[in-house]
């Protein structure tokens, strides 16, 4: 008997049915227009009419009407194709409670989505077969829906209501005297004897049981997007799950099963809260970010350091606080040299901004500007590198010509490799936050080097870890299973589709 029961599925497989008025080649072309996993259960040459507001029939198009079983959408459609151009002209889904009328043998009507629709058949034999295919399908769907609504155990039985009272909790049982305990236990036994014991006969059978969880998932319609929990929606967005997947019956069931296996909605939400990343730190460096803006807001050259305009620093040169603008202080021998020794690498930048008589000192100032605000401890530059010491000390008196300045600047640039040998320990300790920040910027060697691999690694573990990664893996397996199906699996899907026709409520 078991082998006999397993044989019914093969007859359920639907094959394409062509039109009697078309040639075999035209029918084959029609079948290719249906699409993947789509089968026409009946085909006929028709004219499509629609009723306008004046209740008059107006012709819309003509072509081949097909009763299409669309497996991907798990639904049935009436579609009209143009076999010459190979395109779809019109379609109407067979919705719930669809009514198909035939006032004439060749003229069939039904209610469309927007208006009353009619099919005018070119051949009455085709019209008869087409009507039979549609009515048989509607009858089968109606029987299945009624079968699902009726409970398997016959009529509904009223549920017996039983009042179960919780036993009273008294402290005498533990702390009272023995006499009270004995009397209390006797009264308790009498009370128990009076109560009627609950039996299976007193419990009614469940009826119209439907599992509607607070997840917002329904076996037939998928997830309810309007009432979906915000935290679950955030999880689905993180996993890249679309609304169409949440509404799909099979895909939504996979997601729902995953949530149940994980421990339910509350467990998933707790896991999400636990895995939520902490707020990012305000900044990576030690010095606060505010100091840089005021420093940059001052005059363009760093020497100003935001304390005042460029002109005042020259007058304050003897204080050694802002020695940067040495152009005005070339006569003073001590302040200019320290700037030269401190950081001459950036000289090329400032000479362009200060093309006055002594361009060499400004470049050196650019490098030292904020670094040497305290006293300039370093002694005058050694005579080793001729360009640097000569330029600041004798720049105003001995190098009036621009050609000499340019040559000195080039010499200083060439000797830049020697100037980089200044040890970091010899620099004065800066006391202000701004100076410390500038020190850190100039001392690029101390900055932590970040490898290229580290940049790409942080983002990867986050999305693929925990509950998010597990759900993404489930969805990837689901996607692979859908895209890797072959023709044999398609036929199995059709059988399941017939057995599991669940697109209606």
From Swiss-Prot:
Q: Which residues carry this modification: Phosphotyrosine?
A: 256
- Which GO-annotated molecular functions does the record name? actin binding; GTPase regulator activity
Name the segments for region: Disordered: 138-163, 184-205, 266-406, 476-505
Residues carrying N-acetylserine: 2
Q: How is it modified after translation?
A: Phosphorylation at Ser-242, Tyr-256, Ser-484 and Ser-485 enhances actin polymerization activity.
Biological process, per Gene Ontology: actin cytoskeleton organization; actin filament polymerization; actin polymerization or depolymerization; cell division; dendritic spine morphogenesis; negative regulation of lymphocyte migration; negative regulation of membrane tubulation; positive regulation of clathrin-dependent endocytosis
Keywords recorded for this protein, A-Z: Acetylation, Actin-binding, Cell cycle, Cell division, Cytoplasm, Cytoskeleton, Methylation, Mitosis, Nucleus, Phosphoprotein, Repeat, Transcription, Transcription regulation
Subcellular localization: Cytoplasm, Cytoskeleton; Nucleus; Cytoplasm
Please report the name of this protein according to its UniProt entry.
Actin nucleation-promoting factor WASL
UniProt source species: Homo sapiens (Human)
